[in-house]
UniProtKB/Swiss-Prot annotation:
Binds 1 zinc ion per subunit. Zn(2+) binds at C191, C199, C202, C205. It comes from Synechococcus sp. (strain CC9902). This is 7-cyano-7-deazaguanine synthase. One of its GO terms (biological process) is queuosine biosynthetic process. Coiled coil: none annotated. ATP binds at L10, S11, G12, G13, L14, D15, S16, A17, T18, A19, A20.
Amino acid sequence: MAQRTAIALLSGGLDSATAAALAQEAGDRVIGLSFDYGQRHRRELKAAAKVAAHLNLAEHHQVDVNLGAWGGSALTDPNQTVPTSGVEEGVIPVTYVPGRNTVFIAIGLSLAEARGAERLVLGVNAVDYSGYPDCRPDYLDAFQTLATLSSKAGREGHGPQLWAPLVQWSKTKIVDEALRLGVPIGETWSCYSGGSRPCGVCDSCRIRDSALREAGRPDLCSNAEG
């Protein structure tokens, strides 16, 4: 039986790295796909390259999609401030990037169909990540329908399937799985700020560091002080 091919959206963060490693564990030939979208934290692209090399991915592509050209998010607009006050329940945060996952998944599906890949691997997490509308199960279900209807492969009955194994997991479980799989957590990048070191105070750093402490790995926290 031929090895299944999967396209993994690889941001350079912990979640996407863990999802890619899970696909490899399932026996997939994994192709990584990363995006320079004008994000202030471009440091994550270096992390994505390191993760791809560590996992020995079959291919790794970086695509330029300048969503920062029109801003609309604290991650792409230097005039907006990245929040450090914690996640506010029921409020979509200013770190939401308009249309980001829709654009990324669409490009991922294009690559998947071109490569004959059976699935598209996503590291989205609806439980911990601030309630972004494009990280939720209903969004993924709707996009799967779109993917099936909008592609030649889908119309022929063998279109790529969206696979988001982390979508209902706690961040602590993701850390535990990353450790089990040998994901190079120290090489991943989750911080929203544009500095050379994680800030330790943005929402993403807070969630990550809390999970690392719960998993007994404070040495991997932003400030490595536990």
